[in-house]
Amino acid sequence: MPKVKALQCALALEIRSVTCPGVVLKDKEDIYLSICVFGQYKKTQCVPANFPLVFNARMVFEKVFPEAVDPGDVVAQLEYDTALFELIQLVPPVGETLSTYDENTRDFMFPGPNQISGHHDSNRQVTMRRISGLRGIAPKLEFSTTSVITECLISSRKCRTQDKFVYHTAPVEKPHSRLQNRTSRSQKKKSKSPERNKYCINAKNYEQPTTSKSHSPSPYTKRRMCELSEDTRRRLAHLNLGPYEFKKETDKPPFVIRHVDPPSPRADALFGSPGRDCERDGWSRLHNDHSHLGCYRPKDYKVIRTPHGRDFDESLERCEDYLSSRSCSKPQHSARTLLVHSAPSTMPKHSPSPVLNRASLRERFHSDWCSPSNCDEIHDRVKNVLKSHQAHQRHLYDERDPEKEDELELKRGLLYRDSAYDSDPEYSSFQRPRGTLHLDDGEYWSNRAASYKGKSHRPIFENSMDKIYRNLYKKACSSVSHTQESF
């Protein structure tokens, strides 16, 4: 293979320190600096979280441009690359980026005269951008760069570049292990290592078109794929997963659903069949819905009918006989039916519920339940509760108590006497009951003022509360604005 000349760009980067005077970090974990140039990521050693951060790290980045003819082409291609610096603190779980700095690789490698501190010195200082965890001024990065563009032979240089790339992307070693690295390198130089030839072979193989190799699925994948339904397989057919046929290793028993025989027609009349019909229709819609094709559904299942269905029918017959014997009017029977509908759907299997053996509400509370007025009132209240969106637990009816009637009459008499006191100017204010309402700014609203102005206490009280809340809101807004101005 003939050797072709190419241009190689090398960057020697020396990172000195990161300074940020007067800034103290809240976290005490170590910090390191991550650098990305030519798409190659490298990082410095970790240092304590105390400014200034002294790194004194030296790194070399190299990249070959086989299509470049002159250095101008290399510089033009560097405009599309970005040099990135990230100051990262080892805060669990994945670390926290404190500040960053990014610049065009061309301007980073070949800075202008105003970006260099001295005429013969290549030291540079750039201001990084704060992200989080830093309070105060932005940190400043001090480093120096040396850039060289040279010619190389692409056939022999590829092996060397691959070797250097593997070495540079290795984890950063600690200083005490440098001696071991030097001895190992000297031994590798003395002996003819086959690694370089291996890199050359890999580079030649990389030029050839690559082909994907198929692997047999793992047992877990095989087991999971066997559990997919036929609908899911049809959905995955356009992915061309291959002609592999997934077969079950062991035949599993079918999915079992325990089912109870349907109740007798009399029980359906008691509980109401429309609810079950709606539930059955919803279940059929769920099975026939094409939006659930990706969900797992068993292909076959059995229905096991238990002998407890007979007990269920017997309990329903007992319940029906009990309700028919206890019912005294048609509205009461409808109320009982609604009560049964609100109970849980699961019924006892072996014996009827002990609730059926309890005494009725009439026997427990000793009230006249069978009167037509009470039954109509109960029926109307149940209708209102069912129509409302927010049904609260409340009493079905209120018993008429003579003591309550007396209290209402007493309150009416007091109100009438209060109005009579207001109309009588000779009646002393110390002898009559006070009905004044405290307003804002030391004002009071009395019954006499209400009778003169034709306004009751309620709207006056609401206006007073509106003024009070409006003043509180203004005070809160002014206090917030004062605090913001102080900050």
Swiss-Prot record:
Gene Ontology process terms (BP): cell differentiation; motile cilium assembly; spermatogenesis
Give yes or no: UniProt keyword Lyase: no
Q: How does it assemble?
A: Interacts with MYL6.
Q: Return the Polar residues bias intervals.
A: 205-219
Name the job this protein performs. Required for formation of the sperm connecting piece during spermiogenesis. Sperm connecting piece is essential for linking the developing flagellum to the head during late spermiogenesis. May be involved in myosin-based microfilament transport through interaction with myosin subunits.
For the cross-link Glycyl lysine isopeptide (Lys-Gly) (interchain with G-Cter in SUMO2), list the residue numbers.
Answer: K247
Disordered, as annotated region: 170-221
Origin organism lineage:
Eukaryota, Metazoa, Chordata, Craniata, Vertebrata
Q: Give the family, as the similarity comment puts it.
A: Belongs to the SPATA6 family.
Q: Which UniProt keywords apply?
A: Cell projection, Cilium, Developmental protein, Differentiation, Flagellum, Glycoprotein, Isopeptide bond, Phosphoprotein, Secreted, Signal, Spermatogenesis, Ubl conjugation
Glycosylation: residue positions: N181
Q: Which residues carry this modification: Phosphoserine?
A: S216, S218, S264, S273, S324, S342, S345, S353, S423, S464, S486
Q: Where is the signal peptide?
A: 1-17
Alphabetical GO CC annotations of the entry are: extracellular region; motile cilium; sperm head-tail coupling apparatus
List the source organism: Bos taurus (Bovine)
Its annotated compartments are: Secreted; Cell projection, Cilium, Flagellum
Name used for this protein in its record: Spermatogenesis-associated protein 6
**Cystines in this chain:** none
**Superkingdom of source:** Eukaryota
Q: Name one GO molecular function term.
A: myosin light chain binding
